[in-house]
Amino acid sequence: LIALATDGRRRGVIGLPLDMVAMEQGIAGLVPALRPDGWADAAAAIMTTDTRPKLASARLSSGAVITGIAKGAGMIAPHMATMLALIATDASIPPTDLDRYLRVAVEESFNRIVVDGDMSTNDTALLLANGAAGLAEGDPAEFQAALTGVCIALAQAIVRDGEGATKFVTVEVGGAADEANARRIARQIAISPLVKTAFYGADANWGRILAAAGYAGVALDPARL
């Protein structure tokens, strides 16, 4: 069962036709070699400019497992980018529930990262449930938390492996009127070139952070900053 896949799952140079003959020949040879412990090989196979594979997994109290792989290092910005995230569970879950779970997880993970502030024409987050364990997802809250945790781990791995990245920075906003305002401020800080250069140079110029927050389009009380 496929929960969600955005259009355009192809990677590579934009505008060049995909060599379907090579793809079909490759698939024909790969299918007989499929095995349950092939996740690490799959994570390595989808790498492009990545320097290391990205893999995360979680086990539920029911015994079901959620495992995911991802690729991405450049053209990474909020609302996804030139990245792939392929996640599977052996729990038995209806597609409508999978879709809901994945949308929440993606919003709290892949849609909150940035490397270079640029995006691509193609990206995908895919969640499959094959029901092989013969188990339901159990507690919905537990499944959601586990799936979100897997997605966050993969998203953070993408940032840590960002092209030219030397630092991993988390932006936390407190005291905002609502979630939307907090996200706008955090995103503006995260994509600010001046904030990035300050972190790169280990320059504690917090004024750049305030400036970025100030032009995020959200009402601010300077006395609370």
Regions inferred by a protein language model and the residue ranges of each:
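Glycine-rich, mobile lid/loop segments that gate access to catalytic sites or pores
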Residues: 2-110
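A short beta-alpha structural unit
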Residues: 12-14, 125-132, 166-178, 206-215
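Acidic, glycine-rich loop-and-beta core segments that form the ion-binding/anion-interacting portion
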Residues: 94-154
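Flexible, glycine/charged-enriched surface loops at secondary-structure junctions
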Residues: 37-43, 110-122, 153-170, 196-203, ...
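Conserved phosphate/anionic-ligand binding catalytic regions in large, soluble enzymes, centered on
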Residues: 67-82, 115-121, 199-204
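Internal helix-turn-beta structural module
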Residues: 184, 191-225
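A glycine- and small/hydrophobic-rich beta-loop-beta segment
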Residues: 130-201
